[in-house]
């Protein structure tokens, strides 16, 4: 089988057509899907209701199932988490989320992630859209003067976990410009959500640089804006792109199931500590 797809935007995104992720697929098709993900960074599978195991199988074309990061994985059978304001214990329930790559505030940025739409706001203009930015293309087209200024710089990436009875700050120092471990392409790691300061510089010096990078990656030519439909699944390369969420009416219910994968050397099991919450 040769995959058919429809491009979603100029720089990134492809809807996979004539393929049902609920069906069994062989190594040849798995390899095609991996190549499509490498080429387009974000893959859309539209209108196919997936159970957890089916979503896990699809996401694992990009890596090994991991329990690193969001959620308290105490059940060995738990393979996903919920981004939801409709379920007790749901993560990041509502409100706007600025551009970021998941777990960029830890030693290893998460390799890939999928989201599957379970519950959505009842009217189309309610918000809650997911935006993706091609931070590799954005790096390629960065102004030479700005590129030279930020190439050698390292920054503090930081996030706060709220565990209900306590909060915990997790942070890591990494370069503003990274190299994709699989493809070798350079990408802009700086994100509005979690990049807090540049090491060795005063705020008056680094804020203009960070603002310039943020504004650059958020330009329309680098963005794919996804308007969710029930049973949509998005799978993305979490290093090649950053993502964000538009705000939505908190009275509206929204729930997406998330599955995360890593390289085998990075992935952790439910019995291992997660570096993001340790």
Residue ranges of model-derived segments:
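Non-heme Fe(II) oxygenase catalytic core, chiefly the N-lobe of the double-stranded beta-helix
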Residues: 2-233, 239-278
